[in-house]
């Protein structure tokens, strides 16, 4: 999919539960001038921007390039007790978190602030007011529980389910498919009509990450028992009687949902998801749920056109609304309300939620400190308001300009690679060149900021703030319907450590936070920067031409621009890369899913090759010197490999392999084996483990 990296599972699920809030951009303020004008003059890592001490030179690079580049770092680095993994993204996120804390706590401590500063401060202060939250106990969620208890028929159930719909998934940008509500909504450019927005309806309703957690044996059976116990505990904390019997019904209902859910591979298939339905089609195509009542309560009564991403799942979930007893649905909705609210209720609820989702599912020993969770919550609700202040204080204009120059070099290099393709016909090349020519790029931060002035934030209402933020974001998305597509919208925050390809708009976004070591250091050697952030930029460019991006034309319309023979060759190369990654086994009983991760792997291979070409172009015929015994090419590939260094707890790694469209970092680092220049750089021999014969090296772009 389109983002460079997905946070670990529990963070991704938390993000789904707390969606960023914003309103219209009319009257949005221009981007503030950066106050952080001066970039450092010396590299943060080592003498030239690379952590040579993190290497393990006893490992042959041709046998395990990840181990060679980062083996000592892996041995000596401890995963923080409050994390399920640690990697380059997390190391930058920790630094960025400190910056966000300075901004947010400063606003909370100043009783004279107004406007967005007051909203930021009040939101955080409400979350941090543990004494008030403890005193309230379960009371903040009681009105919702009482409303659920009063449901008298399936018509009322349909209205409740519709009223709970939120804009809490993102199919093609952030690769977030998870929602614990029965359905998720994504409002984005229409696959078939690029000039307008469409609402995408997505499967949901599960408390655990995806269907295999309910249907598979072995470890999954143990997790189901732990989940059942978690449900019992949450219901008991709320004082709900017959908790064990209710938990049995809830697990049985969610298991039935899991049976009709699409697999991750199917969900990742954009062609299978491009199902245009009229509102009138739902009653016939997915009988069971009273759809007219559902859409009315969801504020979508007048909306006629939808895209249904998993029609079989929508059909199955709708049928369950009709077939399962009303009381079972009431039990389920009561638990969902409590579980969703738990982080904002008293300590016993928050601790129980972490015990299951953090420790049992992810293996994380310790819950993050409350201030860290408060920073996350505030960023989720008021992200661009915090981001504007982050940019003013911490983002160097010099860094932004340097990154923009690198992007231009990478785009030029990719265009030349298209010209040089021997297997592609001129007809297909013409379309590919049009797409690269139409690519637009945003670096650092948006040109205008969202206006949060209409969002109500109360200093004494932590849960209410979250719910109002979610509803506010939902209404912001609904307001897009019927309007022209806004190609200025950012789908990531400046303080977010990630990068993004927006396939429906043929656009790239590089937030400011990723422009930090080890990905980018303005004082580092160019070879290292091109290997690290250059490969990231190349990765995002290449997403426009991966197995999903290649389905879209230069206008973001889903339409086949390939000749049959070219498409056949492209798919054959993709199959070879999928087989290559499926051979990687992080556990004896679990392999990487090469098909699920194919889009990311194509982007890694093409992105690395493009970054190498761009680096060579940047030299303008000059030959850089050897530094500390490393040639320029060696520094380039080592910069790439160290950017992907990381460690997982076993439970988190298993979950990532099952659910993430990105392969684990250690295998992404081995992408080098598909690039010809890597072999002479490290004198890789045919008998070494990573060696691929020239005809086996995957070269798609």
Outline where the language-model segments fall.
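Intrinsically disordered, low-complexity linker/terminal regions across diverse proteins
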Residues: 39, 43, 256, 280, ...
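Bacterial N-terminal signal peptides that target proteins for export
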Residues: 1-11
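Post-signal peptide N-terminal segment of mature Sec-exported envelope proteins
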Residues: 29-45
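C-terminal motif of bacterial Sec signal peptides marking the signal peptidase cleavage site
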Residues: 19-22
């Amino acid at each position: 999919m389109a983002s460079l990296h997905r946070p670990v599972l529990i963070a991704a699920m938390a993000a789904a539960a707390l969606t960023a809030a914003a309103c219209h951009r009319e009257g949005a303020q221009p981007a503030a001038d950066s106050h952080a004008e001066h970039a450092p003059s010396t590299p943060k890592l080592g003498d030239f921007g690379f952590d040579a001490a993190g290497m393990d030179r006893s490992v042959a690079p041709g046998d395990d390039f990840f181990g060679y580049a980062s083996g000592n770092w892996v041995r000596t680095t401890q995963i923080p007790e409050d994390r399920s993994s640690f990697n380059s993204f997390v190391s930058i996120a920790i630094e960025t978190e400190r910056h966000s804390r300075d901004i947010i706590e400063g606003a909370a401590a100043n009783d004279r602030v107004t406007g967005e500063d007051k909203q930021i401060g009040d939101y955080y202060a409400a979350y941090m007011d543990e004494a008030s939250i403890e005193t309230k106990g379960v009371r903040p969620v009681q009105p919702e529980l009482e409303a659920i208890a009063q449901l008298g028929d399936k018509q009322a159930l349909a209205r409740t389910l519709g009223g709970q719909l939120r804009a809490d998934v993102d199919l093609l940008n952030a690769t977030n498919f998870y929602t614990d509500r029965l359905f998720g909504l994504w409002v984005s450019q229409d696959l078939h009509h690029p000039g307008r927005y469409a609402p995408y309806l997505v499967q949901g309703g599960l408390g655990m990450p995806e269907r295999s957690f309910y249907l598979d044996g072995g470890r999954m059976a143990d997790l189901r028992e732990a989940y059942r116990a978690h449900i019992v505990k949450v219901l008991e904390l709320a004082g709900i009687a017959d908790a064990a019997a209710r938990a049995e019904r809830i697990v049985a209902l969610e298991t039935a949902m899991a049976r009709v859910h699409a697999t991750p591979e199917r969900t990742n298939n954009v062609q299978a998801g491009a199902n245009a339905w009229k509102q009138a089609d739902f009653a016939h195509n997915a009988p069971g749920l009273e759809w007219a009542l559902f859409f009315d309560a969801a504020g979508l009564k007048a909306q006629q056109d939808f895209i249904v991403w998993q029609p079989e799942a929508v059909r199955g979930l709708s049928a369950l609304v009709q077939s399962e007893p009303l009381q079972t649905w009431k039990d389920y909705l009561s638990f969902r309300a409590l579980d969703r609210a738990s982080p904002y209720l008293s300590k016993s609820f928050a601790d129980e939620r972490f015990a299951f989702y953090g420790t049992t599912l992810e293996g994380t020993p310790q819950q993050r400190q409350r201030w860290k969770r408060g920073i996350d919550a505030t960023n989720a609700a008021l992200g661009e308001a915090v981001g504007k202040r982050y940019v003013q204080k911490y983002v160097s204009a010099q860094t932004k300009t340097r990154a923009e120059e690198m992007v231009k070099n990478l785009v030029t290099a990719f265009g030349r690679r298209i010209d040089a393709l021997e297997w592609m016909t001129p007809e297909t090349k013409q379309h590919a060149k049009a797409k690269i020519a139409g690519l637009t790029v945003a670096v650092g931060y948006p040109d205008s900021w969202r206006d949060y002035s209409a969002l109500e934030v109360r200093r004494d209402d932590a849960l209410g703030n979250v719910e109002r933020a979610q509803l506010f974001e939902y209404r912001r998305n609904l307001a897009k319907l019927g309007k022209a597509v806004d190609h200025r919208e950012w789908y990531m925050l400046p303080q977010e450590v990630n990068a993004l390809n927006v396939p429906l708009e043929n656009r790239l976004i590089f937030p400011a936070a990723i422009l930090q070591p080890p990905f980018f250091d303005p004082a580092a050697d160019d070879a290292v920067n091109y290997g690290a952030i250059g490969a990231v930029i190349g990765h995002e460019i290449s997403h426009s031409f991966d197995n999903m991006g290649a389905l879209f034309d230069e206008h973001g319309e889903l339409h086949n621009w390939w000749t049959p023979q070219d498409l056949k060759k492209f798919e054959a190369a993709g199959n070879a890369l999928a087989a290559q990654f499926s051979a990687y086994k992080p556990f004896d009983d679990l392999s990487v899913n090469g098909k699920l991760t194919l889009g990311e792997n194509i982007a890694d291979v093409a992105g690395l090759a493009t970054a190498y070409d761009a680096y060579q172009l940047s030299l303008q015929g000059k030959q850089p010197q050897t530094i500390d015994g490393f040639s320029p090419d060696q520094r380039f590939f080592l910069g790439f490999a160290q950017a992907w260094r990381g460690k997982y707890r076993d439970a988190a790694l298993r979950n990532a392999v099952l659910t993430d469209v990105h392969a684990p970092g250690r295998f992404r680092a081995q992408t080098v084996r598909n690039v010809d220049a890597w072999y002479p750089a490290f004198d890789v021999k045919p008998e070494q483990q990573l060696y691929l014969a020239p005809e086996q090296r995957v070269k798609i772009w």
